[in-house]
Curated annotation (Swiss-Prot):
One of its GO terms (biological process) is L-histidine biosynthetic process. Its cofactor is Mg(2+). Catalyzes the condensation of ATP and 5-phosphoribose 1-diphosphate to form N'-(5'-phosphoribosyl)-ATP (PR-ATP). Has a crucial role in the pathway because the rate of histidine biosynthesis seems to be controlled primarily by regulation of HisG enzymatic activity. Feedback inhibited by histidine. Its EC number is 2.4.2.17. Belongs to the ATP phosphoribosyltransferase family. Long subfamily. It is an enzyme of class 2 (transferase). The keyword Amino-acid biosynthesis applies. CDD domains: PBP2_HisGL4. This is ATP phosphoribosyltransferase. Pathway: Amino-acid biosynthesis; L-histidine biosynthesis; L-histidine from 5-phospho-alpha-D-ribose 1-diphosphate: step 1/9. SUPFAM superfamilies: GlnB-like (SSF54913), Periplasmic binding protein-like II (SSF53850).
Length: 285
């Protein structure tokens, strides 16, 4: 099976890190390679322009793709969102020069020139808002266009707004929200690779479910068992098993990382000892 990933840009690094957490690691170090074998037998990575991934997935040429919601919306590709990822969060915004004393997009001059590479999204947004504008099609950085005089405003992706500010621009409206996702062809379940695809998706969801969670092991004397167990959070309930040749028990539970100090403090107060904390790679539901 083939998984399409961005060949560059803001999603490439996080996509590779995510696949690594799943256990899918590229087995070639040559950046020029466009199709790369992985640590999973029968699974290949294909590096494609992020904006092309939705259409390539739609054709069935690749089985899965990692891209952004903004690119899926812009392409109009008939694909299925299979896994929502926890990276690539951004906003598509309408930004104007800071010198413009406006906050409402409807206050822009008629036939304002807006530079964007998201023509379909921008057109739908402008129609929805009833704004008369002329779209300037670009494929590179939009932020520089007003400074060059090639456009008056832009519609582009921003995460922090720092780049906009650097180029003397300010956002006045959010056109849409975006995030990274795993997409598939609408007919992926009928594919010859359906079983392998399903396993990959299961492992992807498992890796996401494990993010920010810790597993805690502790020993507890018989007399303190009830107090310790009642103090602990768990996904269902703490696991308890008797230690051989001892009046003590091993208790195992899972908690969110931010709750860890509080959980350990309560467990120790209740009588737990020999506490060991380990990372969790995957939680398969």
């Amino acid at each position: 099976m083939k998984i399409a990933i961005p060949n560059k840009g803001r999603l490439q690094g996080p996509a590779l890190q995510f696949l690594n957490s799943v256990g899918i690691k590229p087995m070639a170090n040559d950046d020029r390679a466009l199709m790369v074998p992985t640590s999973w037998e029968g699974v290949q990575l294909v590096t494609i322009r992020t904006e092309d991934i939705p259409n390539i997935v739609e054709t069935g040429a690749v089985d899965l793709g990692i891209t952004g919601l903004d690119y899926v919306m812009e392409s109009g590709a008939d694909v299925e969102e299979l896994v929502k990822l926890d990276f690539g969060k951004s906003r598509l915004v309408l930004a104007v020069p800071m010198s413009w004393n406006i906050e409402d997009p409807r206050d822009m001059p008629k036939n304002v020139r807006i530079a964007t590479k998201y023509h379909n999204i921008a057109r739908a947004y402008l129609e929805r808002k009833g704004i008369e504008a002329r779209l300037v099609k670009i494929s590179g950085a939009a932020e520089i266009m007003p400074s060059l005089g090639a456009a008056d405003a832009i519609i582009d992706v921003t995460s922090t707004g720092t780049t906009l500010k650097l180029h003397g621009l300010k956002p006045i409206d959010v056109v849409s929200e975006s995030y990274a996702m795993v997409i598939g062809n609408k007919n992926w379940m009928k594919s010859e690779e359906a079983d392998r695809i399903n396993l990959v998706l299961t492992m992807m969801k498992g890796a996401l479910s494990a993010r920010g969670k810790k597993m805690i092991f502790m020993n507890v004397d018989d007399v303190n068992l009830e107090a310790v167990v009642s103090s602990l959070p768990a996904m269902l309930a703490p696991a308890v098993s008797k230690l051989s040749n001892s009046n003590a028990w091993e208790v195992v539970t899972v908690t969110d990382e931010e709750m860890l100090p509080e959980v350990i403090a309560k467990a120790k107060t209740a009588g737990a000892r020999d506490i060991v904390v380990v990372n969790i790679e995957k939680v398969i539901k």
